[in-house]
Amino acid sequence: MSDDGRMLRLSRALGVPRSTLWALRTEVEACWVRLRGYLNPAAWLELRRLRTRRDLLLNVATGPYVLDGFVNLELRAYHPDVIRWDCRRNLPVADGSCRGIRIEHFLEHLDPRDEVPQLLRDCYRALAPGGVLRIVVPDVARFMAAYVARDKAAFDALAVVDPFPQDLPTWIDIVNHSFHQWHEHRWGYDVENLTCFLNGAGFSDVTVSDYGTSRVAPLGCDRDEHAPYSLYVEAVKRMHTP
């Protein structure tokens, strides 16, 4: 049985929404990973060594999609090459130690009032002057534009299946899914609000990028399946912080 199938069975047995059970599971795993970093000697040494490294490329909340040449951070042990870390608020690296950081389809899963500002400020701390932060998120503005226009071709371009899924049968259901994804997503982003978040974290040079291209070439290792409906934004840390 799949994880979602088990959660559905547990939800029905307990009378608790699946979204609540998934959130509880994440918090339990995060607590375990934090304790592991203190109590497991191998994990403690791994994190200590990481804090001594410089000129890093960081792949934040990678899931099972690890990248060669990157330090891959992930809460769950999807792959032997990940360093386990709760990436929602901070990064386990030294100040100014990274020349590039990429965050693909993770920011929308974070609380926009608490976690997003903290993580972006910590990315700024971790980047060397001139370092680049690349963020990839669902482009909710495109979903909204397609909805307002009732433009089936625009939804097709966003890789929405035809006919619509059985559990998302209408135009507005598709838009809701882009924002919430069954409560896995916490916030929606367009260029304007993502720029505001980045400016608030200290970044001043914020630009829209494209799939597969970056000011730091390795950061452009974007996942193909996200390309049709993603927004790509890059921000640069100032060369000299006042």
Residue ranges and their predicted role:
Residues D114-C123, A128, V132-T241:
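S-adenosyl-L-methionine-dependent methyltransferase catalytic module, highlighting the catalytic core
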